[in-house]
C-alpha cells in the first residue's frame, strides 16, 4: 500500500511540475532527433531506441539524466547540452503522442517463447505492465529493437547504465547471456 501511495504521489508531483503540453513545439524540436530516432520517433536503426509511444515522464527523465550526466551515451551529448527543461518536456510530449510502428525484426519463436517464460519468472510486468507498454518512469519495451533491448540489459548487468534506482540492475544481474538474448527476441516481437 505504501509503495502504491508513493508512486501516485510521485506521478502527481511530476504532473504538477510539468508545463502545458506543446506537441507542436516538440515536433519542431524533434527534427534534430530524426537522423537517429527516425520520423516521429520510429527509429529504423536497431541500435537507437524507438521513442514513439514512450511515456512522457520516461522520455523527460531520460533526457534530463543525459543532460545531467546520470546516463551516458556520447552520441546524445551534443543534443542534450542546450536543451532547457521546457524543451525536454516538449520533446517528451511529442514522442509520447506518436504511434509505434512495427519493425522488420522477425523473432526466433523458440527464443521468444523462452523470453516470455523468463519475463514471467522475473516478474517484468510488475513494472513494465502487461503488454510491456510501460508506465510513468518505466519504459515501453514492447516492440523495441532487439539490439537495443539486448544492449540495455547488458549495460544494466555490467553497471554501464545505472540511472534506474537499482531496479533493473538487480534484475539484469540474474540474467544469463541466453536469457538476455531470449528476452530481446520476445520483447522485439510484441506490438
Residue ranges and their predicted role:
Residues 21-40, 103, 107-130, 145:
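Sequence/structural segment immediately N-terminal to covalent heme-attachment motifs in c-type
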Residues 1-7:
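Bacterial N-terminal signal peptides that target proteins for export
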Residues 81-103, 147, 173-191:
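C-terminal capping alpha-helices of c-type cytochrome domains
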Residues 23, 27, 41-72, 77-83, ...:
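Gly/Gly-Pro-rich "capping" loops immediately C-terminal to redox-active cysteine motifs
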Residues 66, 94-95, 119, 156, ...:
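Conserved hydrophobic/aromatic "anchor" residues
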Residues 9-20:
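Hydrophobic h-region of N-terminal signal peptides that target proteins for export
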Amino acid at each position: 500500500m505504501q509503495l502504491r501511495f508513493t508512486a501516485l504521489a510521485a506521478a502527481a508531483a511530476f504532473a504538477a511540475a510539468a508545463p502545458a503540453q506543446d506537441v507542436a513545439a516538440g515536433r519542431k524540436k524533434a527534427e534534430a532527433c530524426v537522423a537517429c530516432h527516425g520520423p516521429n520517433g520510429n527509429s529504423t536503426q536497431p541500435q537507437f531506441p524507438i521513442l514513439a509511444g514512450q511515456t512522457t515522464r520516461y522520455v523527460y527523465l531520460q533526457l534530463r539524466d543525459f543532460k545531467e550526466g546520470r546516463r551516458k551515451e556520447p552520441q546524445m551529448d551534443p543534443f542534450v547540452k542546450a536543451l532547457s527543461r521546457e524543451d525536454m518536456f516538449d520533446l517528451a510530449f511529442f514522442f509520447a503522442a506518436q504511434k509505434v510502428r512495427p519493425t522488420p525484426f522477425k523473432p526466433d519463436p523458440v527464443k521468444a517463447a523462452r523470453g516470455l517464460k523468463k519475463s514471467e519468472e522475473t516478474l517484468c510486468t510488475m513494472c513494465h505492465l502487461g503488454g510491456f507498454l510501460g508506465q510513468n518512469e518505466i519504459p515501453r519495451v514492447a516492440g523495441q529493437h532487439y539490439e537495443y533491448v539486448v544492449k540495455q540489459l547488458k549495460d544494466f548487468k555490467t553497471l554501464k547504465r545505472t540511472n534506474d534506482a537499482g531496479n533493473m540492475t538487480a534484475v539484469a544481474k540474474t540474467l544469463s547471456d541466453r536469457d538476455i538474448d531470449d528476452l530481446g527476441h520476445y520483447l522485439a516481437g510484441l506490438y
